[in-house]
Amino acid sequence: MPGSLPLNAEACWPKDVGIVALEIYFPSQYVDQAELEKYDGVDAGKYTIGLGQARMGFCTDREDINSLCLTVVQKLMERNSLSYDCIGRLEVGTETIIDKSKSVKSNLMQLFEESGNTDIEGIDTTNACYGGTAAVFNAVNWIESSSWDGRYALVVAGDIAIYASGNARPTGGVGAVALLIGPNAPVIFDRGLRGTHMQHAYDFYKPDMLSEYPVVDGKLSIQCYLSALDRCYSVYRKKIRAQWQKEGKDKDFTLNDFGFMIFHSPYCKLVQKSLARMFLNDFLNDQNRDKNSIYSGLEAFGDVKLEDTYFDRDVEKAFMKASAELFNQKTKASLLVSNQNGNMYTSSVYGSLASVLAQYSPQQLAGKRIGVFSYGSGLAATLYSLKVTQDATPGSALDKITASLCDLKSRLDSRTCVAPDVFAENMKLREDTHHLANYIPQCSIDSLFEGTWYLVRVDEKHRRTYARRPSTNDHSLDEGVGLVHSNTATEHIPSPAKKVPRLPATSGEPESAVISNGEH
């Protein structure tokens, strides 16, 4: 066919394109799910056991999607001593929409102003919880295309997941993850191994532009999630089997071939059920299952059809029990952030990746294949895989990315526990004020983590102004400008901590860098 390459043609791509660095941000306060059970008057264990959730992070009216993303981007740049001119693509995945026209990415460009770097491709990508993964794929595709100019891509996934009071509220959360994408990475995207499923469904959607709350069909949402997992896993297995056959290896792919398996996590119990679901797929796909000891006791389920089992309690119970050890080995560690902070929508699955990288040594991770299932309602889903580099030596890229996340658990533990009634008051405040113009947030900034960007005001034209709570690493904004090396030998740019010019502080606010998404 004209314009097509022959199937056996080989192209030349940059080597080992993947995740070079990762940063995660979550707010400084949470509500305890056991206390929330008491406050809501539900049975003990409904949230903690039934959903598998221990704590739920939330933000006050001082934080919005722009401030979350400003914070996580600047923290990634600072932690890795990166210059802002080394970014050639910046894309945001989010479903937290505060402006139907102006992108979150355009707000983030304020961090790049003093560097003079405005030649940055990318924009916002939205489809429920899948937008972050779509942005990641766009970044990888850019680096592997003729458009690539040799610089890094930066992907930001972030959301504020909140629900109206009721059964869905304990499945909320908030957070953002920034991923630096480039060649020679320690966590590499497996080329040609994506299993995708797209379908029209009204399982979860947000049609009311004046509300942050979604419309949710809980039962349909679970069915859509599990059916998408079935389809994506089937496509992935076919693609990797085809690759293996080209390499002379004739075998079926199973869960055992993943070193780790991570999922988009609306709540932890669904992830455990999903791992069991993949085990069910392996079982039904194994022509010799009667001879395989790992399926002992499951013989009665040999004739079930996947589409008939979404809510079959007997199947669910049997395969969760049979896959319990696999869950402990391959998935349980990935639920640290989800269990302690809740659902972060687009950044949820990348919080799971951060959890794995934070809890295993480079030596334990080296050479492992990580399965990743990303799901967004509506619906869009992909199962793909990452391959961890073999180089786990001190000072290696793998050593650096794990070291940068080693404080994850202590950061989660350093948050402040807030009483359920205070949490409910904050949710009501957001409900009443998130859409207002000419608004000054009411909550204090004193409880914010150092280095957190926060909302200062929304003016009469809905233009938002932000400031950053000073960090001990900032020293003084008046003590000259620190320098970090760019990726060229002759250039220097101001340190990321000094990117934004300081404006006079508003009444009652500490002096700090201030930026606005309106006129300066």
Swiss-Prot record:
PANTHER family: 3-HYDROXY-3-METHYLGLUTARYL COENZYME A SYNTHASE, HYDROXYMETHYLGLUTARYL-COA SYNTHASE, CYTOPLASMIC. Homodimer. InterPro entries: HMG_CoA_synt_AS, HMG_CoA_synt_C_dom, HMG_CoA_synth_N, HMG_CoA_synthase_euk, Thiolase-like. One of its GO terms (biological process) is response to low light intensity stimulus. PROSITE patterns: HMG_COA_SYNTHASE (PS01226). Keywords: Acetylation, Cholesterol biosynthesis, Cholesterol metabolism, Cytoplasm, Lipid biosynthesis, Lipid metabolism, Phosphoprotein, Steroid biosynthesis, Steroid metabolism, Sterol biosynthesis, Sterol metabolism, Transferase. (3S)-3-hydroxy-3-methylglutaryl-CoA binds at residues 43-44, 129, 167, 171, 221, 264, 273, 343, 377. The modification Phosphoserine is found at residues 4, 495, 516. Pathway: Metabolic intermediate biosynthesis; (R)-mevalonate biosynthesis; (R)-mevalonate from acetyl-CoA: step 2/3. CoA binds at residues 44-46, 167, 221, 269, 273. It catalyses: acetoacetyl-CoA + acetyl-CoA + H2O = (3S)-3-hydroxy-3-methylglutaryl-CoA + CoA + H(+). Catalyzes the condensation of acetyl-CoA with acetoacetyl-CoA to form HMG-CoA, which is converted by HMG-CoA reductase (HMGCR) into mevalonate, a precursor for cholesterol synthesis. Residues 487-520 are annotated as: Disordered. This is Hydroxymethylglutaryl-CoA synthase, cytoplasmic.
